[in-house]
């Protein structure tokens, strides 16, 4: 959620346009909030194609109109693809669509996996998983693994340019530092995380944001493990940069969608939260970072670990 100091005084910047210009950038959860503004930044920085991956195609068409209002000619550079992270079938269909897009002459240069939820109530998806566990972790990992080969294909077209390296950026959060994650001692961690009784115990012990914090911690682990799968080029550098980024505590609708959010959290959000325009700079900046960020956690646009 960011320290009070960084929330108020750290000045965020956009990446050099050369890291985005003419590239194809895909952003999940991009019909509103951080995702929408990250897509807008990409378009303004000269991205050749921006793909809005969204649950509601209708709302995303509205988002498409929004980010191209200043220049309607940009409409043809924005694509809208349906994606529901609460459904593994939807994720697989999305990956298939991306493969078809690339096989037909398209390319994928940057992926920002921004979509996520902060569920404060026990809910199960159609696939039988606790909702935030599936959306923030399982589907995010599945999507990342499915899109990585397509990013590698783009890498093979520009093998010598560090600035042209494809990127896979996962949205994390520094709230992971608060996670108690007592389930880490279990023999089958995912099974325990998917147990309703254990979920209740964890929420009672760690507070209302415990599950969200755990999922964001797991996103960092996902980043580290996927980074290990990336082959190296002849100079020893990764062919695709995989990183995760914290946008800080932002005035997005992540919390407003849920009931039971502690009043103190809402007050902090109002008092020190970054605007989504500002916070989204961290996402698009991460897509322009070099190999030093590979497998790492990025906070306030600085590699932390």
Task: Tell me the role of every PLM-derived stretch.
Residues 1-12, 205, 249-278:
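Alpha-helical membrane-targeting segments
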Residues 3-5, 9-249:
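Rossmann-fold NAD(P)H-dependent dehydrogenase/reductase core
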Residues 8, 304-305:
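Short, contiguous pre-domain boundary segments
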Residues 117-118, 250, 260, 302-303:
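Short connector loops/turns at beta-strand edges and beta->alpha or beta->beta junctions
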Residues 149, 253, 296:
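Flexible, active-site-adjacent loop/turn segments at secondary-structure boundaries
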Residues 220-224, 252, 277, 281:
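Feature representing long, continuous alpha-helical segments
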Residues 267-304:
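C-terminal helical subdomain
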